[in-house]
Amino acid sequence: MAKKVAEQLVDMLVEAGVKRIYAVTGDSLNEINDAVRKNGKIQWVHVRHEEVGAYAAGAEAQLHGQLACCAGSSGPGHVHLINGLYDAHRSGVPVLAIASTMATSEFGTRYFQETDTMKLFEDCSYYNQVATTPCQMPRMLQAAMQAAISGSGVAVIGVPGDVTARGAEEIFSAVKTFPTHPSIRPSDEELDALADLLNGKEKITLFCGIGAKDAHAEVVELSGLLNSPVAYSFKSKMEIQYDNPNEVGMTGLLGMPSG
């Protein structure tokens, strides 16, 4: 029996390292749900509300730094994802949202629970498209996952329920995603200028934002050498506050006077 688009989609998620899909079972997601059952290498986490699923995917991506996935069925199912997707996108974590829709034959007819996912998710995603044919789906899914990983944000792929039930078309160039771990380093001249600045001052305070999230040890070491207090932004709290003897608190939203 030929592989269905839904099975192809699940295979590609597994290949990309996705461990779970947070979603509510039913309706236009039935084919994908059944494909998860058949695959056995990925877990369908049934939540009580799609908003919870989107937040859960964002939390998983933030904790593990890997692509996480949530899904919503047609109409209110995927509309409920939007709060969690905004949170994930603003937090800079890779999340793929599968926005299932009604059948393609009903597009543009004001059919029951019809929405325009392209408009709906435009402001909270790096990639946002709808696959209307089996040929499009693997290429769009690969592009969506790569955009989420490379951009550290949300990617949305709209998948009509009737498309997931059709026979899949294998696109061998679209079966692989590539994790990226870019390292941004200042030039030697900039580092020398910073060293001169720090050496020339007696009282120094370090203020760390989300850009310092992977430099906890370096921040602690530098603050120790300079005997400088360390303040941090809301987004960098989780990365900078812990085990930091010189931290003085957070600034901005929910901040404190010491910060």
Which positions does each model-derived feature cover?
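N-terminal alpha/beta PP-like core and its mobile active-site loop of ThDP/TPP-dependent enzymes
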Residues: M1-G259
